[in-house]
Amino acid sequence: GARIDGQAGVVLDVLTYYSNIEVVAFFDNRVVSKGATIQGIPIIGDIDKFSKFDNSKIDAIHVSIGDNKARYDIYKKLKPNGIPFISVIHPTAVISSSAKIGKGCFIGANATIQNNSIIGDYTIINTGTIVEHDNVIGDAVHMAPGSCTSGRVKIRDLAFLGVGSTVTPDVCIGKAAFVNAGTMVKKDIDDGITVAGYSSKIHFKNIYLDIEG
């Protein structure tokens, strides 16, 4: 993705802290004008044009899209190219030496990941998010700014935690579940369910319910 007012802009800003990393191109499935750039970096075109790009210029890939399913699908599409997926980590993030971070992740400013926690591939741990000890966070999860999990929480693949949401100890959040902003989750949530409010009331099954694999 190449939205400077979205996840791409956040990722690009973090990469300015790393003098050994140069962003050589963006790919974006939206229609963009010929010759378009972001801060002087060319937008080549949609992801289908990736195979035609000079891959000798690419050492690693990062997919900067906030939407879980879109991000996950693009990573799967790019995987056969054999180019490594890089995790982008803000220098102010605090990560325990015993935590494990998967490939293609984004860890935002002032995020905290505590001891023995595991973060799956392609997951976003956004600004100021707290992942407490002994958590298991799946692939392509998005924890929005200020969200917080207590100890021993499990979050399955493709789940989303909204801004300022909290999860109490030992809770499991199902695959592709959606937790609205400010919600406190005190009990397990099934796959594909959207919840909201202090008591995490079930509202409806969300749009990702049909995800397989």
Regions found by a protein language model. Name each.
Residues 87-203:
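Structural signal for interior beta-strand "rungs" in well-ordered beta-sheet cores
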Residues 1-13:
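Glycine-rich adenosine-cofactor-binding loop
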Residues 6-7, 69-70, 100, 184:
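Short alpha-helical
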Residues 18-37:
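NAD(P)-binding Rossmann-fold cofactor-contacting core
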Residues 11-14, 39, 73-77, 119, ...:
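Short amphipathic alpha-helical segments
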Residues 2, 64-66, 109, 198:
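Glycine-rich, N-terminal phosphate-binding loop of Rossmann-like dinucleotide-binding domains
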Residues 32-94:
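Phosphate-bearing ligand-interacting subdomains
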